[in-house]
Every structure is written in structure tokens, then in C-alpha cells.
Amino acid sequence: MNLPLLPTTLVGSYPQPDWLVDKKVLLGRGPPRVRMREVWRVPESELQSAQDDAVRLAVDDMVRAGIDIPTDGEMRRESYFNQFATALDGLDVDAPGEVLSRLGNKTYVPRVVGPIRRTRPVLVRDVEFLRAQTDRPIKVTVPGAFTMTKLAKDEFYGDVGRLIDAYADAVNAELKDLKRVGADVVQLDEPYLQANPDEAREHGVRAIDRALDGIEGPTALHLCFGYAYVVKDKPEGYSFLPELEASSVDQVSIEAAEPDLDLAVLAGLPSKTVIVGALDLSSHEVETAEIVAGRIRAALAHVPPERVIVAPDCGMKYLPRDVAFGKLCALVEGARLVRTEIGGDA
């Protein structure tokens, strides 16, 4: 990929248009783990075409803002999780089970009732469509095996390690197809590594490496505390982060704008590119470019610029679109300021 120093990207999601989703439904619940079809305002017969239009708008916003590595904004998803996680064989999503979320709330999740298998591509058309919208490098996200295991009720395997391995194999098959059709960067979303650090230390690196086995080109992993809309009070540090140095993933995406994070922890990832969260998504206030630049400079005290990518803290799904666009413009300009300061091309 031909990218400038301190390139910019999104973690994944961007606000969906009001004509596509019912924001009262979307904002009235947490991210769904099973299907939430009632969120869509468009009839099923017209939904794919409407989602295509939403992707066009999202990519146009990202390109106009100057984002170097756009996504499709996850316009087709009810959550980062459920589009892929409910498309696998071996699951009952119509009679879901219950587990406790990382916030301690009961949440409905797929029941594992047979062998987990990916029998068909899930996101291939999404990537093909995104690839046709821009000549810039593109990124696509898939929920990781560890997180999918924590958001499922196992009634088949009886062993968490075997369940993780089955999910990882399904993710691996999907990622290979996504790379084949043009995804430049593939990202695993693994928020539950942070939420379950003891179990993550036992299974996390294996889950990542198995999912990424044989994947060529840049790979990323997003590790977060949860959407700012859902999680109001974020901890001051990651319970699982330096452990990722032992994994095969190339890029590690962290929150660094909203939480009061000591960025010295980044020194524990000497072989990784760090996707530094530089936009606070808990506020609708649009940062100035200088505020963003200050957050980037703080990261550069611990990571060389050649190993830094700049992004929002997390997905932007729950923001108003005008706010999200303004924040992306500030992100790009803030990266440009720092790039100029350190002698990179503006």
C-alpha cells in the first residue's frame, strides 16, 4: 500500500443514515448479538439497494475528509458482531440463549447446537462493492473468535478451547476470501479480550493466530472498552495488551482519546504498528486539529511514526453524521500537522 506517514483510517463503523435505520431502535438497545431486523426502515426487498447507497455516502464522506484507508462504514450491519456471527452453521439464532454481557447485563446470544462451520462467504459482496467505490486501500472488520465465543451459549462443545478453535477456523476461511476479492487490511474486532483478561491469557493469542493463519498482507486487531454510547466510564488501562506482542497480528488498534491511558504501555508492543485512537467519541464536540495533533504527539513519545496509524477510538456508529464527518476532518488535519512537524510530506 502506498500510504503517507501517519496514515488515517476508521476503526470500522460510521453513522448510518436516518432513512436507513430507526435511530430510536438503534439507540434504545445495546449492540445486538442476534438479529435485530426491526432496526431497518427499508423493506427487505429494497434493503440491499438502500445499503449500497448508504455505503456510497459513507465512502464519499471518508474520501472528502481525506481518510487514507476507508471502510464501508458497516452500513449493512446491525452491530459490528451479528452480521457474521449469526451466519455460521451450528447456531440457533431463532431461539437464543442468555449470557451476561461484560457490563453484567443479560443479553441474548446465539446458541451453539452443532459444529461451527462457515459454509458460505458472508462479507465477500460487501468487500467487492466497497472495492468498486474507491481506489484507496480498504479495510474490512470481522468479529474475532474469542469475542464470538464469549457471546454465545455453548450447548455442543463443552470446552471453551474447542469452541474458540472452531470459530477461529470460520474466521480464517472468511478472511482468505475477503483478501482474495480486494480487502487490503483485514481486522479482527476482539473487545472481549480486554473484558476477560485471565481467559484471554489462556486462549487469546492462539485464537488470533489461528484466525490469521496464512493471511497475507496487513492484519489488524481492535481492542476496546466498548462503544462510548454504551460504556460511560472507561478504565485507565488495558488489562490485556502487552500479551499481543506474542501474536501474529500486524496492527493493534486501541482507545487513547477518551480514556486516561498511560501510553507508555505501547512500548510493550515493539513489533506492532499501533492504530492510535485520537478522537473522543463520548462527546459530540468536534475536536480541533491541534487537539488531535496533541494526542498523536503523545503516542509518538513511545512509538516511532513509521509504526503509527491514526483513527477514532472506536466505531462511530452512534454519532450524528455531521459530527462524525467533522471529527474525521479534524483527524486528517491533525495527522497532517504532525506529519509536517516531523518532516513527512504534508
Predicted regions and their residues:
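Domain-level signal for soluble alpha/beta catalytic cores
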Residues: 1-346
